[in-house]
Amino acid sequence: IIKLIKKPNTPDSELLKILKGPDLPTGGEIILSNAEKKKIYKTGFGSFLINSKWHDEKIKNGMYEIVISEIPFQVNKVKIIEQLANCISQKKLPLEDVRDESDENIRIVLKPKNRNIDKNKLVDLCFKLTDLSIKYSCNFNVLENGRIPKQLGLKPILSQFINFRKLT
């Protein structure tokens, strides 16, 4: 906002250097190319993926476990565990077990059936079959001039806000 007040003709590319977003209050990894980010902020419309954050931990006999440490915004941990358990019972996932070891931090542990299962392929399959990966839609609807609903990009939204603050 300060940048636009000082220099109203600031190009979108400069605004994008300042604004790192999207910023969501919980964890997960935002999957969004720079081109798609530019499109969303220019048009006010688009979508992006949020994947859960995970890592593997080695255990005995060459085995490993997948540990989910962050889940996407507005996703219920219990629902994810239920989805994983259903996939295990329906034999859609090569997992032996899923455990919730969470305390104040999220910790969902996935135990593969054997050590030969590729961890990246396993996680990709979990993302595909559960809410460990979800798609978010962006739709920047605002009341233009306080009256007319309209979909605007980032710069027009900020300009509208600056004009509103000048009037109030």
What residues fall within each predicted segment?
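C-terminal interaction appendages of subunits in large macromolecular complexes
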Residues: 1-168
